[in-house]
């Protein structure tokens, strides 16, 4: 009997500082423990901590392949069982076809990213990936105003561009009541 490869798409989403990258790294390390071939990618625009590593806010890290175009993943994925993609919201809509093709080829694809921008508008690529995913994990953070569960990323600067790569100087997590779009 022929062995059927069962690919999947998993999405880890939530606001800034909710542990998305931490969870992605955890799942990939578990894959390594299970003797799976694992690779992680990030958009080259994300150079906050390192060009060569995906790094969580807690400084946990895993070696990665920075790419400018999501289609570059195909160049590295032939012998990979589990593919991680961090900060997925930085990629254009072609990431959807890339993830679907990889999953259809039997790969386990785990993406992590913000589901909404600083105005609470969904990132289009993430919205589509959420619709295509077999497994969704929505994380929360802690509201920096009241201490409640936070699902929003509050921008602290006047910059109006949708994508602003930043940290706690530019963003903080907020609950619905304390969020000011």
Region roles according to the model:
Residues 1-77, 117-128, 138-141, 165-180:
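Conserved P-loop
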Residues 27, 93-101, 125:
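A short acidic, amphipathic alpha-helical/loop segment
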Residues 83-84:
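Walker B beta-strand of ABC/ABC-like P-loop ATPase nucleotide-binding domains
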Residues 87-88, 113:
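Walker B catalytic acidic pair
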Residues 90-92, 118:
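Catalytic P-loop NTPase motifs of RecA-like helicase/translocase cores
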Residues 102-124:
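Sensor-1/coupling segment of RecA-like P-loop NTPase cores
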Residues 133:
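Short basic (Lys/Arg) and small-residue
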Residues 142-164:
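Short recognition patches in nucleic-acid-associated and regulatory proteins
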